[in-house]
């Protein structure tokens, strides 16, 4: 987890910078998800996760480093809060509303749900809640940084509990035809 802690520190300092060096480009959503899974493969394999992807893929305009950071934090949280699940899984699915100007990526796990009393605060700086087996490792910065990075990239982040346990994080991207300023 040391790499993840260092990444959080670097992104925290980057978010406070006056000039942000984002590089917006056309990205395959599922391709980027697969790359984030690959970057976290050891962590996922040690926890016994199975990974599923929907067949549909879409292109979005975003900053790859920023999006990879967001996905890495979400994956890390799924592993942290896997609970006693003997068959943990992550499901990446995409929804494109034809009459909407948005594309949504949902990342669903079947780990520990977030207590309803904690849900309103999960994106607050320093909030750790009282769930999970790695409580002593929680900094309360991961989802805070995810929210800040997502705001910078014009991505909306929503987190909700699943009815059968676990959580779903939904990233909603604006539909943009080409990178900004081009």
Predicted regions located by residue number:
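Conserved micro-motifs of the catalytic ATP-binding
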Residues: 17-22, 55, 59-63
């Amino acid at each position: 987890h040391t790499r993840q802690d260092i990444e959080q520190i670097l992104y925290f300092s980057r978010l406070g910078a006056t000039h942000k060096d984002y590089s917006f480009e056309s990205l395959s959503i599922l391709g980027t998800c697969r790359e984030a899974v690959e970057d976290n493969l050891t962590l996922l394999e040690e926890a016994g996760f199975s990974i599923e992807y929907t067949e549909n893929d879409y292109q979005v305009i975003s900053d790859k480093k920023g999006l990879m950071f967001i996905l890495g934090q979400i994956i890390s949280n799924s592993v942290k809060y896997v609970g006693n699940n003997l068959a943990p899984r992550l499901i990446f699915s995409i929804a494109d509303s034809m009459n909407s100007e948005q594309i949504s990526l949902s990342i669903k796990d079947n780990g520990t749900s977030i207590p309803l009393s904690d849900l309103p605060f999960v994106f607050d700086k320093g909030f750790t809640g009282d769930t999970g087996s790695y409580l002593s490792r929680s900094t309360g910065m991961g989802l805070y940084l995810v929210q800040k990075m997502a705001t910078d990239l014009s991505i909306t982040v929503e987190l909700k509990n699943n009815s059968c346990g676990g959580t779903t994080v939904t990233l909603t991207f604006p539909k943009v035809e080409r990178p900004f300023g081009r």
